[in-house]
Every structure is written in structure tokens, then in C-alpha cells.
């Protein structure tokens, strides 16, 4: 992964980290890496609100007098005082050696000593500096040098745009965390984002007409005080039509249930805030068993133009996820996020057990770009789809847009058509589309190679 031939100009000469803020106004880590050539790489790391138990550790100061314990001075110090002295002099083109040096320095299974936020900030900044030193776009550098694809033809990702927020990302009654639109009928990246923008604004107008608030959640989607998943799905379908598009054919729906957030481990039940409709599955006490949850999700896919379900069951309910995949996975994308936490070993376990047919990829869940690529490669080998993802606490860093193109994942999940930290990724993709010209393809429905979507009429 990366060249080990040391060019004097590719030597790392300086590494400097400092504290900045994410999109929620919470501290996070930024890093600057300088090379002997004079090239500079800069990176900022994101932070999640709904986090998996098996994620690499995001190091916080836990000092209640500073940012209510959310400061990252310790992580910053770890970069400046521990990591930097060990990495200065290394070859920036040898990403694997750089990342492994930090992992060895940390010497914990989950990066608890130095912090995944510290390690990732350096990992990303090194890759950016190296790309500049090679006079290459970041996506081309990652693809050719880190992944080894050696291609000039790329796939532009279908976006999953979060238009209604619930769960841990919004202060409303909706239990499911994200309701997203996927412009699968588009032929080009810019056309897909046009469709998404028009649908987003059509939805805003519908919400206003119904007296529902149009405040935004963490990821830029609306957070109306709806009670049920069905309420959100109904108004989304209406918005797609109002924007002049056909539900399913032009724009399909993806949902992130984030079921771990409302799963009661002791009772082994999925407990809804206000409950789903009483007549659904004869649910009692507004809670569902794993089997009932699967039946509920299946029912939703028959009623609404849903193509993708993420974290439909708890991250520890592997048997349930397996059953969900068996039930609807032939034609619906079943994405594992908290289940795998971008961990290659967990992904291998999922492949062996047929737990899902897709994986969500988040850089900060594992904590380095080389480990992220390793997890993507596990999924590709299994013919699973991969979805590159942002976090709810984002920054203006656009690395994930380049990563999605570089790894040819075909899908990206990076928020709504509002909030500049989300739009930055879409704008980067628009530039990449122009840069690639006819060497960049937007696959639309053809992005799904391991499922056979059924025709859906609504």
C-alpha cells in the first residue's frame, strides 16, 4: 500500500495537530503534515452521535470544566508529542508503514491509548500531502497508490441524501434515525444532485403547508415532529412526486433504522418511543421482538419504495440481521454499520455468517485510511456493496468524497442538501465529475450488483 521507495522530497518533515470544531460546535482534531518537497496535507476528523460498541476509541479529555468533557487536548498532544517524533523522516508515500507505526505506538486493540481521532488525523493528512507531492488528485492517488487499482476510469457514487432525521440525530418522536433519498434514475452526478435538491425543497414546502417545523437535524435533514416511520415515508413519497419525479424509478428510499439505539438488551425487545400503530403485528407495550421487527421492516418494503435498510436490528443481534437478509436481502440492500464498525475482522465474520449483503464504511470507526481500505477489500471480495459514510458531527473535510470515487464503492452517504459541511462533499463530487469527464460514470440502478431489485409501483 503505497511505494516504499524513499524519495528525499517525500520525507515527512513536520506534523502538527490542533483543536478545531465539528458541525455541532464540539471540539475535534485537525492535523497538518509537511513534506521535504514543501507540499502540505491538512485533515480534520469527524465524530459520531450514534456510535457502535466496537468502534475505535475517540479520545476525549473528560474534563467537565472544558467543553463539558468533550475537549481533545490529550489527542492533540498525542499527535504533537508522541506520534510526530516517531513519524518524522518516514516516507509519506508508504501509507501502510506510517499507519502501522502509529498502531504499534498505540498498542491497544481499539486505539484507546493515543485515540482514533489522533491517529486518523495524521493518517489522512499524510495521504493528502503525498497526493500533492505526486501532483495527483486525492482520489487518483488513493486509487492508484493505496488501493492499487491502476485505472483511469472511475465510478461516481450514488448519494444517499438524508432528508428526514430522527432517532439520536433529532429531537422528535421518530425512532428511525435517517430517511434518505437515492436518485437512482439519474444518468450523471450533477443530475442526481439536481433531483435531490428539488425533492428536498419540495419536502420543505410540504412540511410548511402542514404546519410542521422545518428545523434541521444534525445531518441537514428536516426534523418534523412526526410520530411514525410511515408518516415520514408518506410525506417523502409525496415530495418526490411534487418535485416531478417517479418514486422508485427515479428516486428510491433508503432508511437507517439505527435499531441499537432503541433496543432493550435486558428485555431483548425493540422499544419504540411512542409506539408504532397498535394494529401492526399486534404489538404490545410499543415494543417488538426480533422476529416482529423483521416482519415490520418487510412490510415497509412492500408498502414503500425502499431499496436499502441500514442497521435494521441491533448491532449484537447477528442472528436477527441474518434472518432479515434471508427474508428480503435478495432484492433489498441490507447494510451493516454498528454491526461491523468498519473493522475488517468483523466484516469477515459477517461474510462467513451471511449477516448482511452490504457494509457502511466510516473512516473514524477504525481510525486509519489503510485499515479502512482493508475493510473495503473484504467487502469487495465477498461481492458486498459498500457505502462510504460521513458522521453526524462533520467538518468541511471532503476526504470521503475522494475515497468513494477512489474505491469505486458506487454509493456515498453524506447528509442532506443543506449545511455546508454536507454540501462540501457533494460540491467536491461535482468537481471530480468535471475533472474525470467521460472517464467518470454514474451507475444509478446499476450500482447494485449483488441484489435484484423488484419492480415497484406506487
UniProtKB/Swiss-Prot annotation:
Species annotation: Mycoplasma genitalium (strain ATCC 33530 / DSM 19775 / NCTC 10195 / G37)
Q: Which GO terms describe its cellular component?
A: cell surface; extracellular region; phosphopyruvate hydratase complex
As recorded in UniProt, its EC number(s) are: 4.2.1.11
Q: So where's the catalytic machinery, residue-wise?
A: 219 (proton donor), 362 (proton acceptor)
Listed cofactors: Mg(2+)
What HAMAP family does the entry give?
Answer: Enolase (MF_00318)
Name of the protein: Enolase
Leader sequence residues:
none
Reaction(s) catalyzed by this protein? (2R)-2-phosphoglycerate = phosphoenolpyruvate + H2O
* Keyword list, A-Z: Cytoplasm, Glycolysis, Lyase, Magnesium, Metal-binding, Secreted
- Gene3D superfamilies the UniProt entry points to: Enolase-like C-terminal domain, Enolase-like, N-terminal domain
- The intrachain disulfides are none
The record's listing under CDD domains reads: enolase
UniProt pathway annotation: Carbohydrate degradation; glycolysis; pyruvate from D-glyceraldehyde 3-phosphate: step 4/5
- Its gene is eno
Q: Which GO terms describe its molecular function?
A: magnesium ion binding; phosphopyruvate hydratase activity
Member of which family?
Answer: Belongs to the enolase family.
Amino acid at each position: 500500500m503505497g511505494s516504499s521507495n524513499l524519495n528525499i522530497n517525500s520525507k515527512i518533515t513536520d506534523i502538527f495537530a490542533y483543536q478545531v470544531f465539528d458541525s455541532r460546535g464540539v471540539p475535534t482534531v485537525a492535523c497538518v503534515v509537511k513534506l521535504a518537497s514543501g507540499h502540505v496535507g491538512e485533515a480534520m476528523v469527524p465524530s459520531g452521535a450514534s456510535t457502535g460498541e466496537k468502534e475505535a476509541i475517540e479520545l476525549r479529555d473528560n474534563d467537565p470544566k472544558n467543553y463539558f468533557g468533550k475537549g481533545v487536548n490529550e489527542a492533540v498532544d498525542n499527535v504533537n508529542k508522541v506520534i510526530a517524533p516517531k513519524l518524522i523522516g518516514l516516507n509519506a508515500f508508504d501509507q501502510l508503514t506510517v499507519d502501522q507505526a502509529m498502531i504499534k505506538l498505540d498498542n491497544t486493540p481499539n486505539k484507546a491509548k493515543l485515540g482514533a481521532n489522533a491517529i486518523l488525523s495524521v493518517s489522512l493528512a499524510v495521504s493528502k500531502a503525498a497526493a500533492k507531492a505526486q501532483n495527483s488528485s486525492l482520489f487518483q492517488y488513493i486509487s492508484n497508490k493505496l488501493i492499487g487499482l491502476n485505472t483511469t476510469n472511475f465510478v461516481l457514487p450514488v448519494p444517499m441524501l438524508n432528508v428526514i432525521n430522527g432517532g439520536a440525530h433529532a429531537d422528535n418522536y421518530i425512532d428511525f434515525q435517517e430517511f434518505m433519498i437515492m436518485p437512482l434514475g439519474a444518468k450523471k452526478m450533477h443530475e442526481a444532485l439536481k433531483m435531490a435538491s428539488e425533492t428536498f425543497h419540495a419536502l420543505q414546502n410540504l412540511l410548511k403547508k402542514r404546519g410542521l417545523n422545518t428545523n434541521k437535524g444534525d445531518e441537514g435533514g428536516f426534523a418534523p415532529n412526526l410520530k411514525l416511520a410511515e408518516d415520514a415515508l408518506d410525506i417523502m413519497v409525496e415530495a418526490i412526486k411534487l418535485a416531478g419525479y417517479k418514486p422508485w424509478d427515479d428516486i428510491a428510499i433508503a432508511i437507517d433504522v439505527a435499531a441499537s439505539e432503541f433496543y432493550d438488551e435486558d428485555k431483548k425487545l425493540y422499544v419504540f418511543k411512542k409506539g408504532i400503530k397498535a394494529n401492526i403485528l399486534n404489538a404490545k407495550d410499543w415494543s417488538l421482538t426480533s422476529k416482529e421487527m423483521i416482519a415490520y421492516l418487510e412490510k415497509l418494503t412492500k408498502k414503500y419504495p425502499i431499496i436499502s435498510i441500514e442497521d435494521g436490528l441491533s448491532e449484537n443481534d447477528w442472528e436477527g440481521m441474518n434472518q432479515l437478509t434471508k427474508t428480503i436481502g435478495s432484492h433489498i440492500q441490507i447494510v451493516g454499520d454498528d454491526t461491523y464498525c468498519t473493522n475488517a475482522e468483523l466484516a469477515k465474520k459477517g461474510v462467513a455468517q451471511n449477516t448482511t449483503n452490504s457494509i457502511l464504511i466510516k473512516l473514524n470507526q477504525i481510525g486509519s485510511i489503510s485499515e479502512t481500505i482493508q475493510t473495503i477489500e473484504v467487502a469487495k471480495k465477498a461481492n458486498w456493496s459498500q457505502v462510504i459514510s460521513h458522521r453526524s458531527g462533520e467538518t468541511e473535510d471532503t476526504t470521503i468524497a475522494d475515497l468513494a470515487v477512489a474505491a469505486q464503492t458506487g454509493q456515498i452517504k453524506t447528509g442532506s442538501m443543506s449545511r455546508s459541511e454536507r454540501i462540501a462533499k457533494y460540491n467536491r463530487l461535482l468537481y471530480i465529475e468535471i475533472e474525470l469527464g467521460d472517464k467518470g460514470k454514474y451507475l444509478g440502478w446499476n450500482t447494485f450488483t449483488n441484489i435484484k431489485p423488484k419492480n415497484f409501483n406506487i
